[in-house]
Amino acid sequence: MPIAVGMIETRGFPAVVEAADAMVKAARVTLVGYEKIGSGRVTVIVRGDVSEVQASVAAGVDSAKRVNGGEVLSTHIIARPHENLEYVLPIRYTEAVEQFRN
């Protein structure tokens, strides 16, 4: 089963926290991290089965938009990322998140 990567980029930290919370509650995904981009941009990253990641990203977008001042800047899902990406980008399952892995 392919392990997909889902990302939501927001403007503002409260919106990304709301998105992350909704994402892990809506589907069987694991939150693997977040990245502060600068200028108020923050990206949250989840991993899981393709259909679960799709559902979680949709839920995260809806929730982030409800935050006062929250703005979703971009979303993306990579269904089957190449294994090399895991060693270069911050999308790996780390020891800290392993206990939450489905």
Curated annotation (Swiss-Prot):
Gene3D superfamilies, per database record: 3.30.70.1710
Family named by the database record: Belongs to the bacterial microcompartments protein family. CcmK subfamily.
Keywords on record: Bacterial microcompartment, Carbon dioxide fixation, Carboxysome, Photosynthesis
GO terms for cellular component: carboxysome
Superkingdom in the source lineage: Bacteria
Name of the featured protein: Carboxysome shell protein CcmK2
MF terms in GO: identical protein binding; structural constituent of carboxysome shell
Gene name per UniProt: ccmK2
Summary of subunit composition and partner proteins: Homohexamer. Stacked hexamers, with the concave faces together, have also been crystallized. Interacts preferentially with itself, then with CcmK1 and CcmK4a in vitro. May interact with CcmL, this occurs at very high CcmK2 concentrations. Interacts with CcmN and CcmO in the carboxysome.
GO BP terms, alphabetized: carbon fixation; photosynthesis
Matches recorded under InterPro entries: Bact_microcomp_CS (IPR020808), BMC_dom (IPR000249), BMC_shell (IPR050575), CcmK (IPR046380), CcmK-like_sf (IPR037233), CcmK/CsoS1_BMC (IPR044872)
Task of the protein: Probably the major shell protein of the carboxysome, a polyhedral inclusion where RuBisCO (ribulose bisphosphate carboxylase, rbcL-rbcS) is sequestered. Assembles into hexamers which make sheets that form the facets of the polyhedral carboxysome. The hexamer central pore probably regulates metabolite flux.
Pfam family, one: BMC
Comment text on domains: The tight homhexamer forms an irregular pore with an opening about 4.8 X 6.5 Angstroms.
Location of the protein in the cell: Carboxysome
Residues in BMC domain copies: 4-90
Broad class of where this protein is predominantly found: other
